[in-house]
Amino acid sequence: MIAVIFEAKAAPAHQARYLQLAAELKPLLADIDGFIDIERFQSLTTDGKILSLSWWRDEEAVRRWKQNVFHQAAQAEGRESIFAYYRIRVAQVVREYTSETGEYVDL
């Protein structure tokens, strides 16, 4: 399982546009083979900071999303006019713990 962590700080005047783009792209994710889930968060301590956490079956699924033309257009707009800063981290999940079993599962 792959986690993609997108951390960004939107320029104050463009934060609403980011949220609009994110809402427009979200339905397209369901069409990507290997997409599992996505959640978006807004920092309580850093004004304008947002985080998007998405889960994918494997790196190939992440590549398919990265190649989506609508996603590419949104990325270009984000780089050009929305974000003052962004960082993307891609991580492989090696283990999962749950409160239900108290045990971990190697993934």
Predicted regions and their residues:
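Conserved short loop/helix modules at catalytic or binding sites
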Residues: 74, 78
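Short S/T/G/P-rich N-terminal loop/turn motif that feeds into the first structured element of a domain
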Residues: 1-50, 57-67, 83-107
